[in-house]
Each structure stands twice: as C-alpha cells, then as structure tokens.
C-alpha cells in the first residue's frame, strides 16, 4: 500500500495531538498510536469537524472538553468509555470518521483546519464532508492563495479533459465563495 501525502499529514496530525493535548481516556491514546502505525487504518480514517450522521464515527475528547471521553457509533451500535471501542476500531474495515472534541472556549486548532482542508482537496467523492468547509478558519491571504490554486487546478483539469476533477475543484471553489455569502446573511 502506498503512503500518500495525505496519509503523512494524518500521521503528523496524530503526532501533534499526542504531543500537545491530554486526552480524557487512555483508550484515545492507545487508538491514536495504533492508527498512526497501521497503514491500512490510516488510509481509512477521515478527521472531521462536523459529524456525518450515517458514518461510523470515533469521538475522542481532550481533557478540558465538556463532552464524554470517548465514544464509537456505527449504525445502531453506540459504545461509550469502554475498552470494547479499541477492539471495534482495530477490526474496522471501512471508512471511519474521527472527531476530536477540543475545549470550546479555546481557539480553533489550526492544524485541524489544515488537515480538514487537505482532506477536502484530496477526496473527490467527499460531499458528506463539505460542511467542514464552513468551519475552517484561514486568513484572507491564505484564502486567496487557495482560490488561486483551485482555479489553476480547474484550468488544468479542463486541459486534461478530466470532468471528475473539474467538478471536484469547482465544488470546493464554490464552497469557499459560499462561506462569504452565508457570513453576510
């Protein structure tokens, strides 16, 4: 299995989480370390800001977040604060969303925002994750750079006659533009 740049970004983000945050549950630390070292699992995880209702999701909380320490839900299954979560995740063979609950009073984690953006750019059939775009914070200059990059990718996809990529990058560009429309209303 090839390691993509996105998988490196995910591993780097997990390292960052383990180094900069303390989690409420030891199971969270076990899982993050396991995911980081498991090539098949790192490929299947998708970090999220907004939970997608019908997706299997692992939720973990840092120590000062006002939510439950760890929970896993998939379909009708809901596990909270139990070692069984570890076993469910390591046996998981499909896409798995990972939500990290931070302290709401603290500033947004910019590293999370960076990873969310990288995932949105890399995932062509990730429409379910587009809500995350409305919560990512970036400066005006960063936004302009992203818009410029997206326009370049759109032009390239047109030159290559790649309709899928054209639609994907156009959709992301429109989401960025929509952020400002919703801000004004």
Region annotations inferred by a language model:
Residues 161-167:
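Conserved tryptophan-centered aromatic signature that marks the ligand-binding surface of SH3
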Residues 1-27, 74-76, 80-111:
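Polar/charged low-complexity regulatory segments
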